[in-house]
A protein has these predicted regions:
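Short, Lys/Arg-enriched N-terminal segments with co-localized hydrophobic residues
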Residues: 3-18
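Compositionally biased non-globular segments, especially hydrophobic aliphatic-rich helices
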Residues: 5-9, 26, 55
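Intrinsically disordered, low-complexity boundary segments flanking structured domains
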Residues: 8, 21-22, 83-88
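Non-catalytic effector/regulatory segments
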Residues: 9-12, 28-30, 60
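Short, surface-exposed loop and linker segments with low hydrophobicity and enrichment for Pro/Ser/Thr
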Residues: 14-16, 47, 90-93
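Short, extreme N-terminal segment that most often corresponds to the first beta-strand
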Residues: 16-36
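Short, flexible N-terminal segments of the mature chain
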Residues: 31-59
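Acidic, low-complexity intrinsically disordered segments
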Residues: 52-105
Length: 105
């Protein structure tokens, strides 16, 4: 009788030591506000992304946007997403908030 070991493949999230995220408010194809958030903590990539979004929303005086399925897919594929008015509960004074990972080490 042959023995075949069972392999378990667990999806581990890679730890990044340095991450920079660029957030931009865009109105009529023009940059209104922008900011770069740098995170050198030992958190996971997901935690760093959420912490950066919290920091951006606080700095721009915005409510936190809702991550729609399209935002999640765009961010997973391109490391970039756009939060439009559909992602915010309150009215926003711009067309969209672009959130883009510009550096990961």
């Amino acid at each position: 009788m042959a023995f075949f070991p069972t392999l378990f493949i667990l999806k581990e999230e890679r730890q990044y030591s340095n991450m920079r995220i660029w957030a931009k408010e865009i109105l009529d194809n023009r940059l209104i506000k922008d900011m770069v958030v740098t995170d050198n903590s030992d958190e996971t990539r997901t935690h760093k992304v959420f912490n950066a979004l919290d920091e951006v929303c606080h700095a721009f005086d915005l409510g936190k946007p809702i991550w729609l399925d399209s935002n999640i897919t765009d961010f997973q594929v391109h490391s970039k997403t756009r939060f439009t008015k559909d992602s915010f509960i309150e009215e926003i004074p711009f067309d969209y908030l672009e959130f883009h990972v510009i550096e990961e080490d």
